[in-house]
Amino acid sequence: MTGIFAEQTVEVVKSAIETADGALDFYNKYLDQVIPWKTFDETIKELSRFKQEYSQEASVLVGDIKVLLMDSQDKYFEATQTVYEWCGVVTQLLSAYILLFDEYNEKKASAQKDILIRILDDGVNKLNEAQKSLLGSSQSFNNASGKLLALDSQLTNDFSEKSSYFQSQVDRIRKEAYAGAAAGIVAGPFGLIISYSIAAGVIEGKLIPELNDRLKAVQNFFTSLSVTVKQANKDIDAAKLKLATEIAAIGEIKTETETTRFYVDYDDLMLSLLKGAAKKMINTCNEYQQRHGKKTLLEVPDI
């Protein structure tokens, strides 16, 4: 009978640690890396590079998009920081959990139970906080996507050859070209006519087509950004659903852990299974924290 109780306890405790580890591993390997933020950082810089290539109306939309993308990134990293904090708690508590197996007794078993419940409870709370931050990130992406649709419409109007913005760009090009032609005159009135004729040919044959190409490139940039933002929003939404499943699983195993008797006679294999599960989660936490800049990692107890 004692052996059956021990096996049941091992199964519950091992499942508790592995469920928490699975949620963290999911966050570490998928959710935390689902958005290519390096690409987004470069994109945000590019937004400023094009500021001379669109109308004031479009400029306002671009400014809004930039703010929304930065806000989405901030919210995303809030979630990352929340999980980082959970890792800090987990590594300390699981190290203590492992050490309590030395000269095992009922008091130490009770302490181990408290430790696991604390880890699971903190995991539910921290991952729910992360979920809220991810919701904010997703909402900002969604709003940015709406602004990008409005921007595409605005740029289509701006870059039409009949638009006032396009004509203002052509007028600017003509003014600069004719001013340059006049400045280079050395052959009197006839030279001026010839220079203006050359300038007109350059404007119509080269500069205006180049303007069209440049404006088209700007619109293509924002079209590509729109696709990226929509995909990022879809990825976060899918990840949130998966994370919600992980949180629910932790909540369920926490309830089972609370009703499980911890003080039982473990054999060597049972101890190895429990210590192995705890050490694996410590390593998962260390991996996560190291990827986020932590230099000194907690060593796994070896007993």
Curated annotation (Swiss-Prot):
Transmembrane annotation, as ranges: 179-199
Domain of life of the native organism: Bacteria
Post-translational modification (record): In periplasm, it forms a disulfide bond, which prevents the oligomerization. In outer membrane vesicles, the redox status prevents formation of the disulfide bond, leading to oligomerization and pore formation.
Pfam families to which the protein is assigned, alphabetical: HlyE
Source organism: Salmonella paratyphi A (strain ATCC 9150 / SARB42)
UniProt KW keywords: Cytolysis, Disulfide bond, Hemolysis, Host cell membrane, Host membrane, Membrane, Periplasm, Secreted, Toxin, Transmembrane, Transmembrane helix, Virulence
Sequence similarity: Belongs to the hemolysin E family.
Record flagged with keyword Disulfide bond: yes
Protein topology in the membrane: Single-pass membrane protein
SUPFAM superfamilies: Bacterial hemolysins
One annotated GO molecular function: toxin activity
Alphabetized InterPro entries for the sequence: Hemolysin_E
Protein name as it appears in the record: Hemolysin E
Disulfide linkage: 87-285
Any one of the GO BP annotations: hemolysis in another organism
